[in-house]
Amino acid sequence: MHRRSSGSSPDADDAEDSLASRSSEPSHGCELPEKPLPEIARTGTSIDLRRDTNGKSTPRSRNSSTWRTLSSATTTWASHDPPRYPAVMITPQRLAIEASPDSPHRSRLARLRSPWSCSILTALTTILACVFLFSIVRSFSALQTGSDGCGVPVMSPTFLRMVGFDTEHTRFASKYNLFLYREEGVDPYNHENLGLNGAPVLFLPGNAGSYRQVRSLAAEASRHYAQVVQHDQERLRAGTRSLDFFMIDFNEDMAAFHGQTLLDQAEYVNEAVAYILSLYHDPRRTRRDADLPDPSSVILIGHSMGGIVARTALTMANYQENSVNTIITMSAPHAKAPVSFDSDIVHTYKQINDYWREAYSQTWANNNPLWHVTLISIAGGSRDTVVPSDYASISSLVPETHGFTVFTSTMPDVWIGVDHLSITWCDQFRKAIIKSLFDVVDVRRASQTKPRAERMRIFKKWYLTGLESVSERMLTRNEPSTLVTLEDHTNTILAQGQRLVLRELGHRTGPNVHLLPVPPQGVSGKKFTLLTDQRLDRTGEQGSLEVLFCSVFPLHNGKASSVFALNMDSSDSSGSTRLACKNAAVDEIHLPASTRTSRNAYDRARPFSYLQYDLEDLAEHQFVAVVDKARVPMKGWAIAEFSDSSDALIKARIGLGGLLSAGLKVRLPANRPMLTEVRIPALYSSLLDYKLRVVRHHQAGDPRELFAPLLRQSIADPHESKFFVNVDKVNVNLHGLAPYMPPPLRQTSQNGVSFQLWTDPTCDSTVDITLTVDIVSSLGELVMRYRTVFAAFPLLVVSLTLRKQFQVYDETGFFITFAEGLDSALRSSMPALLLAMSLLASSLATSTKLPTGDDPFHWATNSTETPIDFTKNDLLLGSQDAFFWFLVPLFGLICVGVCVLLNYVALIVLQILSVVYGLWNSKSGYIRRDEKGYLPVFPAPSPRRRMIKMGVLLVLVSTAIPYQFAYLVACIVQLATCVRAQWHAKETRSTAHYNFANYAYSVFILMLWVLPINILVLLVWAHNLVVHWFMPFSSHHNVLSIMPFIILVETMTTGSMIPRVTTRFKHVTSVLLFCIAVYSAVYGVSYAYISHHLVNILAGWLVSIYFFRSGFSLHRFWKIVEGDETPSTPESGSHMKKKP
């Protein structure tokens, strides 16, 4: 193997510079140069620029006698030179310029030395990318937020620090703190007695969150107990007590970015739970009844990453069994880590989720450590722009018997989407949370809560609309409480199938009973619905409207009528019919009021009351009694009917392609039921938004209309419902099938989106429903679902660009600019790779799982269940729908534009810094232009000094600082190298200097795109220093993760240009860069942290190329260590150029 020397003189660079500014002259004879040119031209015409005796540069063609002599001499020298480095063939840093005969030399040099150049293709690509990027950002900011209707809470907070929770209880006492909340003027307490009287609740703040965020929830708990619960003796006897809110101050730690921090917080939570429970054993600190058991468990409420910390605590070794049985999380990313830049956070998430899945996969409850735990995940919806609400889903972790996911827009009397922070203080939301907690508390039990099944029923009642298929009806569990006696002249019995319409109430004195006969059983698809603007009375209440489900009460059944709580009997006739009735208010569903003046579902107006039962739920009843109890005439209405599913349910048989091309239009007939449901199975993706319009074909403001149309948009998993009052035009977006989400534990049929429309059936008019895809609004959905793509895909672009630069350099000796390399990649490898990735995305989405019988390892799994691959959606787009294959080239296009923009921003910064550097460097007075081509571009310290600096940095990485800090230092050093290289290239205008400047700049751009992967962990480390927590990370001290970067950057500080590789080993560089590009596209979103290690391997390969050139040996290494080898100094004959 032969290594080509870099022997071109600095005069050749001057000749090249003059060639860039003058036209080429014809070749002519001249004297032989003092030193032969050691490069053999391979293709085209090679121009040998040498100074003659007069000092003038003269171009010489290959056909001249001088060239033939040089070529022969050089070939002879190469043939007798023994191979020194068998691994790679190293070529010189400075070469004769090779160009095709028809290419102007001036253009070639201009392209070589102008990093600002931009081809038409690159310009058009950038403009198109900017248009798409602007449209996406504008759509996200303008169309994805919605209105803000949260009420402002009132509170008087006091935080008591638990000073007793010190280093005797936890090793984190100096970093974290535990507090108790007391509402000033409401909660009795003093320094000796904390006033602990109820069930303990522990609040966990989120990433960089404050413990003070709990004050709105805790204040509502104190006030609601003092104003309502404390005066309800029945609830007090049932075990309801106050809620003692504790909270942890995590010192605004950032658990979302660092897995070890997450584990530390979980460990502290378990220690805090043990300490809280111990407080209730001390009678001096509590005001509890002596006959009540001491608490053995704590309710956990976590916001954002605090919810993940709560789940993690149950997997830790210091967790006390059954010390936690209820967890409520708000905007917590359960399904997937919010960012994948840290390996620890990705691995920790996997371990936590695997533990929960394994626990709930157990057949027997005794084998499930989480059997008594209920987990409720609450998401804010599209207003949350910090954590994608799709990640709040727990369907892949917990079965429906132990938890569910719900959105705030679903919760009764809340009906509003909230952002990431307002979910902790929104007035409507906090009241629903606190009321549900008071319902599940039972201090008569050591667990302080009701049994798991009862807790789940209560949470469904408070958090779900009641219209879901999983909602339970309590009517069948109740006993008859009202005896109704029928009289012919005071009661109305409607015919079978007739609709009851009450337009006013209170026209008769005394209760007016309206009876609807229940259809006979066996009629499929029958449903009872009732809607009214009045609140439904419970038994014994003196309101205006009561709904009863009745069965005939026999005259002689041995049961006295006195056992009923209420006896509606206005007749003394012994032959009158009597009905034993159950009150239906227990199943009352609140719907937002929809009138002609309504604007939003969350308006502060009295909600509508709604009842809905399937015919099977009414099997033991014969009549539905609607009792008008108003004593005086009053405004109020009610509509009740039995309807057929064939009339009330419309299933749209249309695909996504049909929606995109023509949309969907449904006309509801005039004789429709009050409730009509339009179900569209094709609508399941969270990446598409829609426009829906409801048009009523009757005169606006019709006085006969009892209420304006009310629309509910819903999906079953997760439980997301949105209500639209006085509906006309609606922007529809949903959180259905989302990218990168793991599959659910139990596969269910995909029913898509359901639209339920309540309209006044008495208006006798048709209604048109039109649905179309909203392309502009859909662009905004890409931000939250694919925001990490914009950190991964640019690495693909940069890798392919650098790959093209190295290919050209190894072939020609010119290291082209980043802009030229990007343009070349756009014309060659990049479109092919994006096309291949598009085909891969389509195939991944359409691939199906092999049947169990075809699986060679089927014997190792449960024969009755197919194992679920929870990582199958981690690749590429993470989409289960092949329709979105076009997102790959779209993201590629946008990232090309982003890389071009960043390139020019970096060039501007370098230009400014190089000017500053030039002004500072002008004090030295001269610029040295070395005569030997392989000397450094600019002076550098001795090898021994460089090795000492690298050694110190590596020792610090292995002991005190994370390698991410060393990477940041390397980026800064590389930036300084680029500044110096660019200034020297402009001053000397030599090809070698331009080569090195382009090479150093491209490496800097590559490192710059890897920097975001490391910067988040670095922020965690810096935060720990700020809070005086100096314990080093147990991870991120792997020296091998940073050593190649340090050596490469330190080597480049000497100005050494990387040698050319002309053997087959040049393909190693190409393959490594291509692998980085492919990995960035396929795994870059889900496992971004590995990109750092891949680029680290590339840096190691580049370092090895340097070593092969310098003839690395142990002997020379020891000479450097001992200080015997010093850097080369310029010869006395060096050309010196005086600075202006």
UniProtKB/Swiss-Prot annotation:
EC number: 3.1.-.-
Pfam family, one: PGAP1_TMD
Glycosylated sites: 63, 862
Topology versus the membrane: Multi-pass membrane protein
Gene Ontology molecular functions: phosphatidylinositol deacylase activity
Active-site positions on this chain: 304
GO cellular component, one term: endoplasmic reticulum
Localisation: Endoplasmic reticulum membrane
TM spans (from-to): 117-137, 782-802, 882-902, 905-925, 952-972, 1002-1022, 1039-1059, 1070-1090, 1094-1114
Enzymatic class: hydrolase
Alphabetic keyword roster: Endoplasmic reticulum, Glycoprotein, Hydrolase, Membrane, Protein transport, Transmembrane, Transmembrane helix, Transport
Residue span of region Disordered: 1-84
Function noted in UniProt: Involved in inositol deacylation of GPI-anchored proteins which plays important roles in the quality control and ER-associated degradation of GPI-anchored proteins.
Family the entry assigns: Belongs to the GPI inositol-deacylase family.
Name recorded for this polypeptide: GPI inositol-deacylase
Organism in which the protein naturally occurs: Emericella nidulans (strain FGSC A4 / ATCC 38163 / CBS 112.46 / NRRL 194 / M139)
Lineage, broadest ranks: Eukaryota, Fungi, Dikarya, Ascomycota, Pezizomycotina
Chain's gene name: bst1
